[in-house]
A protein has these predicted regions:
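Inter-motif core of Ras-like GTPase G domains
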Residues: 207-229
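Phosphate-binding/switch loop-helix module in NTP-utilizing enzymes
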Residues: 169, 173-215
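Single conserved hydrophobic/aromatic residue that forms the stacking wall/gate
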Residues: 273-280
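G-domain G4 guanine-recognition motif of GTPases
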Residues: 138, 192-193, 227-231, 252-260
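GTPase G-domain guanine-specificity segment
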Residues: 204, 241-245, 257-271
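Charged, compositionally biased N-terminal leader segments and the immediate start
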Residues: 1-25
Length: 280
């Protein structure tokens, strides 16, 4: 199943909400300035973002909507085309492909976004594709996080490298990579803490893990994936910017898209950070 088939399923609630909202707004056959402004306001309220909403409004204003046709359907088609043009270049088709050499993926994100569950699901795909996988339990600040990752490793048959709660997370990452090298295992997924005593400590620890990884392999981490919760709205833009300042984010995973009618935030993220690939 490709990225847009998955979006179709996860985006259904948002798509239904947008279609319903457009039907409420568009009561005239001609799209005048007042209607355009209402469409823009509605898109902003759906978490599409100010800049992307303004661009969509401008695109609609330049299109000639046939008054004989259903205006809602016409605008829905414009939105679909816009989203496709925005996101197709960002799809990471190579992310789940088998690798010939060691591949270390650092998974980041704040608590509650579904990081550990996401790691488990990614690990299962790697296993199903024939790759052995190591989980590195670097969220040592929460015993529950280690236990949850261990549960996933048991479930899918992955190897887990862990330590006692409170241990140095970077040392756990180092041991995981060394174990991978010594046993010719090519996939390492590193779980990280989502919340420490303050934001500076969180970012310092995240950077430390990345630096230690690089010492074991100059090309690592090969991917730094940020997990974002779609229900968090525009706040995820700030999360992305904060993490990207510390370690360059190479991919995004959006969770809980099926749990919100305001999934437009994925459009906002894609528009704001066109250089960042998205992983479904």
């Amino acid at each position: 199943m490709g990225i847009f088939e998955k979006f179709k399923l996860g985006f259904k609630k948002s798509a239904d909400n947008i279609s319903s909202g457009l039907r409420d707004i568009i009561v005239k056959k001609e799209i005048d300035d007042e209607t355009l402004n209402k469409i823009e306001e509605f898109l902003i309220s759906s978490d599409v973002g100010i800049d992307a909403s303004a661009e969509i409004k401008n695109i609609i204003s330049q299109k000639k909507i046939d008054p004989k046709k259903n205006a809602v359907e016409e605008i829905n088609a414009i939105l679909k085309e816009y989203i496709l043009e925005l996101m197709v270049p960002l799809e990471r088709k190579d992310f789940f492909e088998n690798k010939e050499n060691l591949n270390v993926t650092l998974i980041s994100g704040v608590n509650g976004v579904g990081k550990t569950t996401t790691i488990g699901k990614i690990g299962k795909i790697f296993k199903d594709n024939g790759s052995e996988v190591i989980f590195s339990a670097c969220d040592t600040f929460r015993a529950a996080a280690i236990e949850q990752l261990e549960s996933w490793s048991d479930k899918i048959g992955a190897i887990i490298i862990k330590s006692n709660p409170g241990s140095d997370p970077a040392s756990v990452a180092y041991k995981a990579i060394e174990h991978a090298k010594n046993n010719n295992i090519r996939r390492v997924l590193i779980d990280t803490a989502g919340r420490l005593q303050n934001k500076k400590n969180l970012m310092d620890e995240f950077k430390k893990i990345a630096n230690v990884i690089k010492k074991t392999d100059e090309s690592a981490p090969h991917d730094v994936v940020l997990v974002l919760d779609a229900t968090s709205g525009q706040n995820i833009i700030n999360q992305l910017e904060e993490f990207d300042k510390i370690v360059k984010i190479t991919g995004l995973i959006m969770t809980k898209l099926d749990g919100t009618a305001k999934g437009g935030v994925l459009i906002a993220v894609s528009y704001t950070h066109l250089t960042l690939p998205t992983t479904p």
